Amino acid sequence: MQPRSVQIFCRIIDNFGDAGVTLRVARRFLAEGVAPLLISDHLEVLAKLLPGLDPTAPRSVVDGIGVADWDAFAADPDAPADLVLETFGCRLPEKFEERMAVTPPKLTMNLDYLSAEDWVESCHGVWGLHPTLPIRKLWYFPGFTDRTGGLTIEPDYEDRRAAFDREAFLRSLGVTDPSRPTLYFFLYPTNDVVAWARALLSIETPLNVLLAPGEGTDALRDAQTEDRK
C-alpha cells in the first residue's frame, strides 16, 4: 500500500525522544512523497527540533511537514488520512476515532519503542481490535532482527555521520575540553537521583556531563547540591 497522506499522533512524555522519533518519521514520509501531519501535545518541545515552528499556532506547515496542536485537533478533527500512525500507544482522540469508524483509513498502525528484547518478535505485526469501535490496528515494533520492523536509516545517514564534527558540536554546547569522556544524562523523576548524584560526584576522572532538560535533571542538580553541603 502506498499512502498519499499520513497522520502521526504523538504525546510527548520523554523529553526529546518521542518528539524526535515522530519528526524523523514525518521527514521520511515526506521524502517518499507522502504528505505528513504531525499531531502533538507539546509543540514547544517539537519547536526546539523544528526551527520555524510557532508552538502557539494550532496548525502550521514547516519545511513541508504539517503540524497540529493535539487539543485543537481533538476538538475538531480532520477526516482520517490514508495512514493513521499512533505512536507509543498514545491512544487517539475520541472524536477522531469516531470519524475513523465511519470513514476508515487504509491502515491504522501503532509504532512502538525500539527494543532488542526477545519478546518484541512475538508482538511485531500483530493486529489489535478497538474495544468498542470497528477499528483494527497493526502493531509495529522496530528492532534488530528480521522478525521485527528493523531500523529506519536515511539514504544520506552515512555521509552526515562522516561529516559530523564532534568537537565543534561539544564546544557549541559550552564544553571547554571535548577530549574528556562525555556522558549524556537523561532520567525520569522517579529514578534514584540521589544515588546517581553521589555516583557522579565520586568519579575522580574529569567528565563532561550533558544534561537533558526536564524534571529528572532538575532533581539531579538538587541532589548534587544537597550532597555537597
Question: PLM features: what roles do these ranges have?
Answer:
Residues 9-134:
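Active-site and donor-binding regions of nucleotide-sugar-utilizing enzymes
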Residues 7, 37, 109, 184, ...:
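A structural signal for isolated positions on well-ordered beta-strands in alpha/beta enzyme cores
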Residues 1-6, 142:
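Positively charged, low-complexity intrinsically disordered leader regions
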Residues 168, 172-229:
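Donor-nucleotide binding loops and adjacent catalytic segments primarily
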Residues 112-193:
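A nucleotide-sugar donor-handling region in carbohydrate enzymes
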Residues 64-66, 137-139, 222-229:
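Active-site regions of enzymes building and remodeling cell-envelope glycoconjugates
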Residues 5, 82-83, 182:
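Structural motif
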Residues 31-35, 102-107, 133-136, 201-213, ...:
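Structural alpha-beta junctions
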